[in-house]
Curated annotation (Swiss-Prot):
This protein's record includes keyword ATP-binding: no
Family from the record: Belongs to the chloride channel (TC 2.A.49) family.
Effect of A836K: Confers similar gating properties to isoform b; in isoform a
Protein name as catalogued: Chloride channel protein clh-3
Coiled coil: 625-657
Effect caused by changing L833E: Confers similar gating properties to isoform b; in isoform a
Amino acid sequence: MGIGTKILSKIEKNKTSDGLTIPLTPTTQKQSSSWCSFESIKTFFRTVIRDWIFLALLGFIMASLSFGMDYAILNLQNGQMRLFDLVKEYHFTLAYLVWVGYVVGLILLSAVCAHYIAPQAIGSGIPEMKTILRGVILKEYLSVRTLLSKMIGLTLSLGSGLPMGKEGPFVHVASVVASQLTRLVHGSSGGIFENESRSGEMLAAGCAVGVACTFSAPIGGVLFSIEVTSVYFAVRNYWRGFFAATCSATLFRILRMFSVSAAVTVEAHYQTNFPPQNVFLPQELPIFALIGLVCGLAGSIFVYLHRRTVLFLRRNWLAKMIFQKYWLIYPIFIATFISSLSFPLGLGKFMGGEERFSHTMKEFFVDCAWTAPPNDSYACPMPTSNATSSDSFDIRHWKGDNYDYSPFVTLSSFQVVYFFLAILASTLPVPSGIFMPVFVLGAAFGRLVGEGVFSLDPYGHISGDIQFFVRPGVYAVVGAAAFCGAVTHTVSVAVIVFELTGQLCHLLPVMIAVLIANAVASYLQPSIYDSIIRIKNLPYLPDIPHTTSLYHQMLIEQFMISPLVYIAKDSTVGDIKRALETKTRIRAFPLVENMESLALVGSVSRSQLQRYVDSQIGTKARFAEATRRIKQRLEDEESERKRREESKSDDTEDSLETTGAGERRASRFLIVPVAKNGPQVAKNETLTGLSEENARKILTVEEKQALFDAASLATPKREMSGKTINPVHIESHHTIGDIFRSITHLSFGRQNFPKKNNHNEFDLFGEERTEWEDMMLNQKLDLSQLDIDSTPFQLSEYTSLFKAHSLFSLLGLNRAYVTKKGQLIGVVALKELRLAIEYLQSGKVPTPGMSIFNEPPTEQSIYEKSARLESGRATGDAQNAAFVTDNGEDDAQNDYIQPPLEVVRRGALTPNRMSELTRLENVRTTPESPHFEVSSPSTSSSCVSIDFSPLDAANSENGSVGGLVLNVPSLPTRARSANELTRQNTHVQINLPDDVHDEKF
């Protein structure tokens, strides 16, 4: 290629869109190069901000919050112990009051904080985050207000020492922080829900960080958050969770390292010191499997009792009557009850003594035998005099000061009592988690089994190796992982245990026990998080058990909603309006080709249809039509006036009235005072004259500067007082009179807008408004003004329930339309899938080819108790068919202890509508356009408004038109009488308020 060809090629590349060429100078090339470099740097920096720096900042913030909360909790708990130590030697009753009062006070403060700042902070947070990641929006659940309430309330509740956890609430806290950071990065208008895909990625990372900064376990935190919040997880988001969790765990461990008392924080790193070899024998594996089996059964019982307790508090008539009016009684009573049972000088001495519930984990993991004799080599050593509670284990907490109690008694008492106390504590209206209590209970059970095995065979005689010791601490680790896995239905809890203990020598026993416990519990009960979702009636799709083939046999045609409401291409605006008004809870409407074929062509969201209807017959559309009509009428009047002027050019009958300043055209209206005893008008008192041209100008200003009232005229029957406005007999009256008659004939009225809308608009009233609305409602649908989803998800009527459940879970669907050869025959939403699953779980067998909604109810029917079942059957509305199950969804709105969360439907997020207009009842003046609004005292009467302006109003600096706005009281004969008054030059008397004086005109 020659040099000339290269130059021409470069010139062609640098041509602009206008056909011009840019000379190839060195300066231009340098600027282009620098510009490209700047854009590249900007793009790279934006990418770094949105991913790496964002995730690192999220991890660092959560680590700091976690460490700060642990420090505050430790000081609160130590404060209680110091107060108790001061008084326990003097008086038993005083010690009891101090112990109980301290706990009750903190719980009461936490409950008040959560109740009045943000009720969304109550509870764990993992169930709610599970629904949010599914696509549900919970009102104000990720707000700063909720974050503040959660942090304060959780610190107070954990500082009380009750059996509560921190892991679940911190998942919620991390999600809120992720949401707020997203708002800062992407702007306050967007937030976490601006992009649903983006929100899922960041919230998933936030959940992982919440677990990681609680246990300092980044790997287990990521895996656990995925298990409890996701059904299907996108692998591309894996690195986000690990990176943010690693940043959080790293900073958290560094902060603990520099903390003096870090070893005894509430959620500490429980380092164990088991030897790498000979931790367990193969002969012990059946015992570990048995621990998993028992923990699976106990975990199912725990979930069941928790659900029954919550439902009992909702349904019991006495609880309803008390807690509805005095909700503080419940937290006070439960806090008093739990703290009384744990009182160290009472029953508490058989459950660990003065050791706090959250601090017992390290004692359960200690590598010594509690039941060994004091002089045994494997016995737990006594603490030294200069040892602190952070680096020693005091066996006297579990055996008494004089070794009076057996560890079997104290461990058994601890498990039984705290098993029920943990359930009661989880029902309190305060921020609290459930992970840590079940973790401690599992460790206590494992320790009990380990001590029992040690008592029977302390030196491993079953193996023939006298050098081997049975280590109860290993059993405690296995029990903690197994029971926690059974309650939460997770396997990743084993990884958390490995990171908590810092050892992998007990990997095999832990995995065996966790898998068995998880399998047993999954067969008997849902996880604690799914149970809470059902209790709170949050919209979420339950899992399908793989133990029966009924889920493969039930077809969509047996639980779809049919017939359903749809929109056709030939539908009218009225059809759409009726559909929106009658089906207020449907979020999207299917669009079909026509009423006959019902061929599905797409779907339209409710918000789109609502905006379309508003644009056709809404307030703004009506105002625009009124403005068009008044302008058209005034233009016609102008043309008519010019025609008459041309035909009567020699007519000079118009007279001018001379004032002190000069001559002006006479006005048809006079403002004169009216005597108290009667409406006598003095015709020699005039305000000022308005020319015909100025009156026309005032009436043709933009609609935002003119305001008209309805012409439904009715004069109040009362004696007139104050001042009046009087018409004068002039020959030019026909022009202004014609305009007046035109306005009254059009029935334009004055309305009062909300304060945020200070503009004036024309409006239609009466028959004209009705005729216009009827005309608009009969118009055909204009598809060009709608954003149509042309590819809605469709399923065949023969799709199985199992396959539909998999598709909904994998793709994150909210609804799917059921078609037969392209013809729309029904719709299936998340609610129908959930009801079908619960139908099969209740033990019923569906009749082939028959809808489960049309089957006759039986005694065991889960639909029998629903008051809205018949409504759902009759209308076919998927949202109106709500059924009652044993989960207590019918009582979700009656929970006075833990207020229900409000679900925000995306279809309800429509633009703000104009509020209902109110009528003016008093006089107002504005400096921009000085005028007076005179209205009838009767609230039911309407007025006609005319704006008159002085001659020099058009010359004002800001171009605005000032003047006098007069609201003429209506007459019984309505607009026809107003026209008669104008044509006959009848004296019109308008009542003015007493504070209006002549100088204001």
